[in-house]
């Protein structure tokens, strides 16, 4: 029973007694340990282990942040860092958040106009248009897409479109980012919407119902890719499940 109130965050109802109990238990210990992740908490590792046990083999490292838009920011950074490219591709109708990078790959101009200029080298293709994918080449660092668009009105792409997108990313060494901040955590009948398309992203971003009303988000990728964030500069080692 997934309640869609409060921007799709309350997936296990409001003030579920078990959630309240666990929050109180954690407050009695501590809430935060060191800014740059010099120490990790056991409960963070348990969260990472539990989540990644439900995901495909290459999605085996979780980095925890405060929100979905932060998860998308980190995913975009990782795509650029891993490929040493600058171009990002998103889709018309997309919404990925309101921070600088996430807003850049979002498509609603009413939300973007007051904050321009945003990130350069961002291109928006028509959503669910198979032919438009031919625009993509080896100059692209990452492609970010909602497996089901939310802000645009619950738009579901075709199986053909999603599988061609995965194939093009593989052929051009592009990182494919699935933003499941709205569509994830069981809202489609599977834990994540990408499971309906028989493909797996390189990076998965999560939020909203992932925290059940608490301010938490995350992005999941492979240990190999996540290790790029270990230094120069790092993103906080405590949030990496290895």
What are these regions (language model features)?
Residues 60-64, 204-206, 233-238:
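Short pre-catalytic strand/loop immediately N-terminal to key active-site residues, enriched for Gly-Thr
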Residues 155-189:
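Catalytic PLP-binding core of fold-type I/II PLP enzymes
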Residues 94-149, 153-159:
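PLP-dependent aminotransferase-class I/II
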Residues 16, 40-45, 214-215, 219, ...:
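PLP-dependent aminotransferase class I/II
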Residues 1-8, 12, 240-241:
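Single conserved hydrophobic/aromatic residue that forms the stacking wall/gate
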């Amino acid at each position: 029973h997934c309640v869609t109130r409060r921007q799709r965050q309350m997936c296990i109802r409001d003030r579920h007694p078990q959630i309240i109990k666990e929050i109180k238990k954690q407050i009695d210990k501590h809430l935060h340990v060191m800014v740059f992740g010099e120490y990790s908490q056991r409960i963070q590792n348990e969260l990472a282990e539990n989540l990644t046990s439900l995901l495909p083999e290459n999605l085996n490292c979780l980095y925890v942040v405060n929100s979905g838009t932060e998860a998308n920011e980190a995913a975009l950074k990782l795509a650029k860092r891993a490929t040493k490219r600058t171009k990002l591709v998103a889709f018309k109708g997309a919404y990925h958040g309101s921070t600088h990078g996430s807003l850049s790959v979002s498509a609603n101009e009413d939300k973007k106009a007051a904050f321009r200029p945003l990130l350069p080298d961002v291109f928006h293709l028509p959503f669910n248009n198979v032919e438009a994918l031919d625009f993509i080449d080896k100059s692209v660092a990452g492609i970010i897409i909602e497996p089901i668009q939310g802000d645009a009105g619950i738009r579901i792409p075709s199986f053909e479109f999603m599988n061609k997108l995965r194939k093009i990313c593989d052929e051009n060494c592009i990182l494919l980012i699935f933003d499941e901040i709205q569509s994830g955590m069981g809202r489609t009948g599977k834990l994540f919407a990408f499971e309906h398309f028989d493909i797996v992203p390189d990076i998965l971003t999560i939020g909203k119902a992932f925290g059940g009303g608490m301010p938490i988000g995350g992005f999941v990728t492979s240990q190999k890719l996540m290790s790029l964030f270990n230094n120069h500069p790092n993103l906080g080692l405590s949030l990496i499940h290895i």
